[in-house]
Amino acid sequence: MKYTTLFIFIVLISIPGQIVQANKTPMDSASMEMAIALLHESDLSRGNVSGIEWDIDIESKSKGKTQRNSLRVLVKGTNALAIYQSPIKVKGRKLLMKDRNMWFIKPGLSKPVPISPRQKLLGGASNGDIASTNYAGDYTIKSFTKDQFNNEPCFLYDLKAKNKKVTYDRIRYWVSKKRKIGLKAEFFTLSGKMFKTAFFEYDHTIAVNGEERPFVSKMIILNAMVKTDKTIMAYHNIKIKKISPSSFNLNLLVR
């Protein structure tokens, strides 16, 4: 009997993708509630509020070539409308995300083009990166452990996408315990390979429910396979404001 048990154990740990957590115990309900609450707090500092507008300047450097785009983004919860401001050749084009569905809208086209949040926008930035972050709603917490980043105490989340409509399949995410903001993220492909890393800076502040809190000023994306490739998303002109639901009406946007 003991040899049968040993054989089964060896087979289990040999199966590709099988995760054996001999020293870990499942989170209790209180720990899970705390983990979700902290993740939600970190989402607020990356745009998941009831009404907000910002400008993004995206700069991508790859193989000695630099590309730039600028967009104005209107956000209401998980809905977002991004309007290209520059360069001139793309000005007026739009990206709409509504209920985690996404479309590309180009002046002169009679119909919007369905796109995926996972598709490349510019450099290391994906379409979904321009929208607000809703990790607390879009991902399942697979694990939640204490860690550090740059000597700052953090909680390290291992997040798994709830569906294929979200931007990434799996994320490892470091959230500051004290400041309640995301500091670093590692993004993984469907096959489980890490393909990019992001670091976040918070030089802006916004008022949410009467409370001042940090707001993202920069997202720096590094390609895990091509070390010299780098994309910077810089956030400017942050404004808390009322956003009309009609801003996300697909029929109105294609007129």
Residue positions per predicted region:
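N-terminal, post-signal-peptide region of Sec/Tat-exported proteins
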Residues: 50-81, 85-87, 180
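Short, surface-exposed charged micro-motifs
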Residues: 70-72, 93-94, 172-174, 199
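Sec/Tat signal peptide C-region and signal peptidase I cleavage site
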Residues: 15-22
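Hydrophobic residues embedded in beta-strands of well-ordered beta-sheets
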Residues: 79-80, 102, 112, 182
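Gly/Pro-enriched, hydrophobic low-complexity segments
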Residues: 152-248
